Each structure stands twice: as C-alpha cells, then as structure tokens.
Amino acid sequence: MNNNEYQIDRALEANDETLAAVRNLLAQLSTKEHPMDMELLSRILDSECTLLYLLRHIPTGEIVGMITLGTYSLLTGQKRWVEDVVIDNAHRGKGLGHTLLQHVRSEVAKLGGGSLLLTSRPSRVAANHLYQSEGYQRRETNVYKLEVPAE
C-alpha cells in the first residue's frame, strides 16, 4: 500500500472495535438497516468463504474503510465477489477505494486468480466510476431478488 497513513489487514476475530467500525461503515454504505451483532460478525469472520479487510488510519488507529471478498466453488468454476466496499465519509477523495480494490485484486491473485465480480446500482455514480477506472467491465445481465420469509 503506497499511502503510509493507512494499513489494510484481514479481520480475523470479532471484537468490540471491529463490530463498531463495521456498523458505522454499513450505515454509510446504505440507508437500509443491516443488523450486525457479535455473533453474526463472528460467523462471517469464521467462514472460509468470506474475507473481510479493514482499512485503518494509522495516526488515529481508527478503522475507516472495509471491503469484503466472497469466494466459493461451483460446478461452473470459482466465483470471487467484491462486496461491502466503503470508505468513511471523512476519508473519501484520497484514493482509498482504489487502494482497497487493488488489495483485493492482489489477494485473488494469491488465491489462484480468476474473475472478480461485483454489482453496483447505477445511481452510485462515483462507485461505478471507481470500478470502471480499476478495469472492471460492465456485463449485460439481470439480477433477480426473491425475499423468502423465515419459517
């Protein structure tokens, strides 16, 4: 990472600091409520398929960004998805989104490479510009969603 004021580390265990930071960053990512508690965070971090990377501002020690890499195998091949890309409002405009995406690209290369996929709403103009500037190409596809209630 080129910027000496920031450091990226994989989150390996759930703790109060990580939980508070994830809650704060999720609130900045979406207006939709994302319930997050210690149990859920622990399950996510314990999963071999989910890698959460945290961006820390070294001078303050504050976690100011995150990115999630989801990876799993299917009959059609290895899938690697980028999710939950967010930089704290106070640290935006410094190229840190690029830094997180480049870090994940490097991690995927270490895992054997392959396609790196993500989705982004068209209304997120800055995010879409970021992804395109990193070499992501828009695919023509439909994404469908079905809400299934719990029993």
For each feature predicted by the language model, list its residue ranges:
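A conserved beta-turn-beta hairpin within the catalytic core of GNAT-like acetyltransferases
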Residues: 72-82, 92, 139
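Conserved N-terminal entry element of GNAT/NAT acetyltransferase domains
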Residues: 1-16, 151
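Conserved beta-strand in the GNAT
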Residues: 54, 62-71, 81, 86
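Active-site rim helix/loop that mediates acceptor-substrate recognition in acyltransferases
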Residues: 31-54
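Conserved active-site alpha-helix within GNAT-family acetyltransferase domains
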Residues: 62, 98, 110, 122-140, ...
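Conserved acetyl-CoA-binding loop-helix of GNAT-fold acetyltransferases
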Residues: 87, 93-106, 133
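Active-site beta-strand termini and strand-to-loop segments that position acidic
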Residues: 56-58, 146-148
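Conserved hydrophobic beta-strand within the GNAT/NAT acetyltransferase core sheet
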Residues: 82, 116-120
